[in-house]
Amino acid sequence: MRTLRRLKFMSSPSLSDLGKREPAAAADERGTQQRRACANATWNSIHNGVIAVFQRKGLPDQELFSLNEGVRQLLKTELGSFFTEYLQNQLLTKGMVILRDKIRFYEGQKLLDSLAETWDFFFSDVLPMLQAIFYPVQGKEPSVRQLALLHFRNAITLSVKLEDALARAHARVPPAIVQMLLVLQGVHESRGVTEDYLRLETLVQKVVSPYLGTYGLHSSEGPFTHSCILEKRLLRRSRSGDVLAKNPVVRSKSYNTPLLNPVQEHEAEGAAAGGTSIRRHSVSEMTSCPEPQGFSDPPGQGPTGTFRSSPAPHSGPCPSRLYPTTQPPEQGLDPTRSSLPRSSPENLVDQILESVDSDSEGIFIDFGRGRGSGMSDLEGSGGRQSVV
C-alpha cells in the first residue's frame, strides 16, 4: 500500500504542464532572435556611419546621437566583448583602404602632396568624428584614437613609397608630412618597440634633424656613435644596483648635525668708537665642485674663454672627497700654460658615477675648504661634513 501511494505522488508531469513549458521556451527563443536582429541592425548602422565619414559624406542631423546610443547598447550585450576586434578588423581596415586607394600608385612629389592632403583630412575630420562616435568606449585601452593612428601608420604611411619620395633630390616636404610622422612616432603599442615602429623612425630621421630615436641620436650628417647620456646613466645604474638604486635620498652623516654652519653675528671694527652698534652677518661658505673640463673654453677664444687671475684649483672632475680645512688650495699654476683637455658630458657622468660606486657611504663634502683665517676663530668647530 505504501509503495502504491508513493508511486501515486511521484507520477510524471501532466500534459498541461508540458504545454505551458513549450510556449515559454519558444518565447525565450524569439526574444533572443529579436535581440540578435537588433544588435545586427545596430552594427550595420555604425558600419554605414563610419564608412560614410571615410568617404567624405558626413553624417545626417541627429545621426551622431543615434550612433552613440547604439554603441552603448552593444556594450551591454554579449557582442560587447568583441567590439574592439570588430572595430579593428572591419571598420578601420575598410576605412584605411578607402583612403589609401586614392594615393596608392603615386610617386615622388605627387605622392608627398597627396599624402599630405590625405593626412589633413584624416587628422582634422575623420579622427575627431571617430572619437565622437565611439565616445562611450573611452577609458578602455587601447583607445579609439590609438587604434586609428596605428592603422593609418601601417595601412597608409608604411605601405606607400614614402621613403623613396623623401630620398629624391630637391624634394619639397610639406609641413603636413612632418606633422604626420611626429604624431605617429608618439603612438606606441602595448608590446613595445616593433619592426613597424622602427621603420617609421627611419622616415622621421629624413625630415627631422637631429632626432633622438630608439637607438640613439641621429642627424643629417649620419648617426652618432654614442647614445644619449641618460641612456648610459640608466644602464650604469641597472648594472651596479648599489647605493643610488637603493637609497636615492640625500643623507647626512649625523642627523643632528646641520648641513651648514649657523650664521655668526659680530660687530664691525670701529663701530664701538662711533657709539653705534652695527651687526654684520657672516654667511657660511659652501664649496662647490670646479667647472667640468668639457664645458670650459680654452684660453684665447674671447672674453668667455679667457682665464683671469683666479687659478684652477683642480684639473680633474669633482672628487669624491674634497680638500680638508688644513690643506690650502693649489697655487702657482700658470693659466696660460695649463690647457684643460676636453671631455664629453657622458665621460663626466661616468666619472661621477664611478666615484659614487667606490664609496658605499656616499660622497663626502667638506664645507671648511676656502675659508679665511679670520673666519676660523669665529666659527669655532670648523667645517662640517655631509653626504650627498
From Swiss-Prot:
Record keywords, A-Z: Cell cycle, Phosphoprotein, Tumor suppressor
Stretches with biased composition (Polar residues): 336-346
Biased composition (Basic and acidic residues): 18-31
Keyword Phosphoprotein: yes
Residue ranges of the region described as Disordered: 12-31, 254-388
Keyword Phosphoprotein found: yes
Positions of modified residues (Phosphoserine): S252
Region (Interaction with RICTOR): 10-95, 188-218
Annotated PANTHER family: PROLINE-RICH PROTEIN 5, TARGET OF RAPAMYCIN COMPLEX 2 SUBUNIT BIT61-RELATED
Cited function: Associated subunit of mTORC2, which regulates cell growth and survival in response to hormonal signals. mTORC2 is activated by growth factors, but, in contrast to mTORC1, seems to be nutrient-insensitive. mTORC2 seems to function upstream of Rho GTPases to regulate the actin cytoskeleton, probably by activating one or more Rho-type guanine nucleotide exchange factors. PRR5 plays an important role in regulation of PDGFRB expression and in modulation of platelet-derived growth factor signaling. May act as a tumor suppressor in breast cancer.
Family the entry assigns: Belongs to the PROTOR family.
Name of this protein: Proline-rich protein 5
UniProt gene name: PRR5
